[in-house]
């Protein structure tokens, strides 16, 4: 290639050399931009689908506990005003829990995540059904009915709540696992991309240096020959 370059006139030689160098660094710049865009896009995906939902899952778990606590208060208190207050808390906790579920649902983009959400929906529906029966029986100052409702909470509601909590815990574990896997994959790709960039820079530097040496020699040689002729004629 350098031999072909040496046969060109100096102007054409320099233009071709500069075009080659500009092309190389243009490709390198494009590669860097593509990597940056890929990183930004995938980092955003990790945040939206794994990091942020972990906080929402934790809040959903907290709200489910609030639902159970409010139910216990409803069947445990012997004051009408306190029972009504706990009913309001119960309704708010149910609403908040379901809002968090709907917030989490769109971020479950994997088959495993969808399966976990289906399990949570099933467990929540079953728990709500038993919970409603408990409140229907125990939302009273009647001691006998309150005791009956408390037994229902232990015998019927507790296993349903445990199933709901297990499903939420499984979703959290899955989300953390998938998020870690995505981060590891992104890290691997970034290391590979940086390695490629370093190699391209090194090759470009070596090529540019070789090109400059070849051009300088091709210019220097005829000048030296011309100088020798002048010395001979002198």
Predicted regions: what they are:
Residues 12-19, 48, 52, 56, ...:
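Internal alpha-helical transmembrane segments of multi-pass membrane proteins, especially GPCRs
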Residues 25-50, 76, 176, 185-192, ...:
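N-terminal membrane-insertion alpha helix
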Residues 11-39, 199-207, 211:
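Extreme N-terminal signal-anchor transmembrane helix of membrane signaling/transducer proteins, especially
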Residues 20, 177-229, 234:
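Selective recognition of signaling/oligomerization transmembrane alpha-helices
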Residues 42-129, 133-160, 180-181:
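Membrane-proximal N-terminal soluble sensing/regulatory segments of transmembrane proteins
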Residues 1-23, 149, 192, 220:
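Positive-inside N-terminal membrane-insertion signal
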Residues 166-182:
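Juxtamembrane amphipathic/hinge helix adjacent to a transmembrane helix
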């Amino acid at each position: 290639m350098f031999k072909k370059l040496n046969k060109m006139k100096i102007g054409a030689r320099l233009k071709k050399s500069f075009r080659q160098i500009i092309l190389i660094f243009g490709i390198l710049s494009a590669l860097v931009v593509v990597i940056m865009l890929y990183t930004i896009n995938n980092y955003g995906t990790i945040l939206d689908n794994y990091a942020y939902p972990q906080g929402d899952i934790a809040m959903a778990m907290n709200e489910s506990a609030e639902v159970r606590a409010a139910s216990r208060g409803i069947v445990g208190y012997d004051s009408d005003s306190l029972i009504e207050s706990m009913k309001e808390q119960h309704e708010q906790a149910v609403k908040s829990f379901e809002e968090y579920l709907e917030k989490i649902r769109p971020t479950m983009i994997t088959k495993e995540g969808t399966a976990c959400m289906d399990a949570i929906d099933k467990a929540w529906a079953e728990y709500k059904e038993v919970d409603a029966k408990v409140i229907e029986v125990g939302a009273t100052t009647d001691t006998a009915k309150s005791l009956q409702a408390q037994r229902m909470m232990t015998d019927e509601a507790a296993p349903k709540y445990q199933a709901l909590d297990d499903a939420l815990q499984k979703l959290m574990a899955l989300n953390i696992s998938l998020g870690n896997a995505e981060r590891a994959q992104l890290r691997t790709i970034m290391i590979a991309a940086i390695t490629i960039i370093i190699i391209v820079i090194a090759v470009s530097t070596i090529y540019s240096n070789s090109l400059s040496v070849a051009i300088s020699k091709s210019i220097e040689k005829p000048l030296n020959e011309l100088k020798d002729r002048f010395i001979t004629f002198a």
